[in-house]
């Protein structure tokens, strides 16, 4: 009797894990975006390009810091609210949400993170 209960509990745990699991689209901390939607690597590349820009009359009016601030505002993107479709933008769900898809990787929607996703 105890073995049947243990097997049923394991099966229930496995099924709930499969249903609530979200496939990892990108691994590592480098895939995380800052508040402007720009990765750290892209930000470094933008700063490097600004430093290497040739000086002309249009650029002389702005320092590198002002140009970076202006470029940040143009690259902002809005996030996708909960229950919104995220098929083509899996990393753009709003804060405390994640893009969750069905078993075949379609019908993706931004939904509340599961308990284990919040913990890391």
UniProtKB/Swiss-Prot annotation:
Primary localization: secreted
Is the Coiled coil keyword given for this protein?
no
List cystine links. 79-94, 86-99, 93-110, 101-108
Q: Which residues form the propeptide?
A: 22-63
Which superkingdom is the protein from?
A: Eukaryota
Q: Where in the cell is it found?
A: Secreted
User: Which body tissues produce this protein?
Assistant: Expressed by the venom gland. Not found in the whole body.
Which key words are in the record?
Answer: Disulfide bond, Ion channel impairing toxin, Knottin, Neurotoxin, Potassium channel impairing toxin, Secreted, Signal, Toxin, Voltage-gated potassium channel impairing toxin, Voltage-gated sodium channel impairing toxin
* Region forming the signal peptide: 1-21
Q: What does this protein do?
A: Probable neurotoxin. Strongly inhibits voltage-gated potassium channels (Kv1.1/KCNA1, Kv1.2/KCNA2, Kv1.3/KCNA3, and Kv1.6/KCNA6, with the highest toxicity against Kv1.6 (74% inhibition at 1 uM)) and mildly inhibits sodium channels (Nav1.2/SCN2A, Nav1.4/SCN4A, Nav1.5/SCN5A, Nav1.6/SCN8A, and BgNav). Induces activation of protein kinase A type II (PKA-II) and MAP kinase Erk1/2 in primary nociceptive and non-nociceptive sensory neurons. Does not show cytotoxic activity. Does not have an impact on Ca2+, cAMP, and NO signaling in the cell types analyzed.
Q: Which family does it belong to?
A: Belongs to the xibalbin-1 family.
Q: What else is known?
A: Negative results: Does not show activity on potassium channels Shaker, Kv1.4/KCNA4, Kv2.1/KCNB1, Kv3.1/KCNC1, Kv4.2/KCND2, Kv10.1/KCNH1/EAG1, Kv11.1/KCNH2/ERG1, and calcium channels Cav3.1/CACNA1G, Cav3.2/CACNA1H and Cav3.3/CACNA1I.
Notes concerning its domains: The presence of a 'disulfide through disulfide knot' structurally defines this protein as a knottin.
Q: What is this protein called?
A: Xibalbin-1
């Amino acid at each position: 009797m105890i073995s049947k209960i243990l097997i049923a509990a394991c099966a229930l745990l496995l099924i709930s894990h499969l249903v609530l699991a979200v496939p990892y689209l990108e691994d590592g901390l480098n895939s995380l975006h800052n508040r402007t939607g720009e990765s750290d690597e892209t930000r470094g590349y933008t700063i490097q390009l600004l430093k290497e820009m040739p000086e002309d009359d249009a650029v002389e009016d702005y320092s590198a810091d002002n140009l970076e601030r202006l470029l940040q505002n143009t690259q902002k993107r809005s996030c996708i609210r909960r229950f919104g479709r995220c098929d083509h933008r899996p990393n753009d769900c709003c804060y405390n949400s994640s893009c969750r898809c069905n078993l075949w990787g379609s019908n993706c929607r931004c939904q509340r993170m599961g308990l284990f996703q919040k913990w890391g």
